[in-house]
Amino acid sequence: MSEKIVKLKEGIEGLFIKNQRFNTTSISFNFYLPLKKENVAENALLPFILTSSGKDYPSFSALNFKLSKLYGARLDASTEKYGDCQLLRMTISVIDDRFTFDSDSLVKQASELLLGLIFNPNAENGEFSENDVKREKRKAIEHIKGEIAEKRIYAKNRLISEMYKASPYGLPKCGTVEMVEKSQAKVFMPLGKICYPPLFCVFT
């Protein structure tokens, strides 16, 4: 296995991890944002909204059809805490080019798809689709309630919130149910402008 960090352009770095043992390639875009109470819930929704549709694929079915044409590529999104930062991660996984018959690189097509979803979102006049926002807010609330119902996870989260009361790290990574309900995530915020530099891309 080999690793290499490459400066792709100003403010963007790529981490390339090469390992012939794996049959798939994953491309991840990682955005580090300041962890703040006033927008933790809104930020947490962003990767899920962005990977559910795009300007070129305005519906979930259209996006799924595109993924099926890429040999069943898979999109994933997550929100984590990393110190006093909120980490938003969006990933696409595809079969490695070694195992395809297409003349055009499958990894290249997958990278372009993910880039399009992130930087050319399904937004009109600066606002996301209302249906997309409602759906992801509902899923986020279900996720938060699920963690509350899971005693070990709830106890761990409560311990962290008490230990780090005076620090941003004490905030829940996705906010609370009340925060999600009140969030104004309908407004599109260009991640490249609000995240800490550098934007980190991981290719494995």
Located regions from the model:
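Acidic/histidine-enriched alpha-helical segments
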Residues: 64, 120-144
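Short, polar/flexible loop-turn hinges at active-site or ligand-entry regions and domain interfaces
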Residues: 53-56, 97-101, 120-129
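Glycine-rich, charged/polar anion/phosphate-binding loops
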Residues: 12-16, 187-190
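Scaffold signal of the M16-like zinc-metallopeptidase fold and its non-catalytic homologs
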Residues: 141-197
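M16 family metallopeptidases and their MPP-like homologs
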Residues: 15-17, 23-43, 60-116, 153-175, ...
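Non-catalytic alpha-helical coupling and interface elements of nucleotide-dependent molecular machines
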Residues: 51, 72, 116-119, 123, ...
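Active-site SXXK
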Residues: 43-51
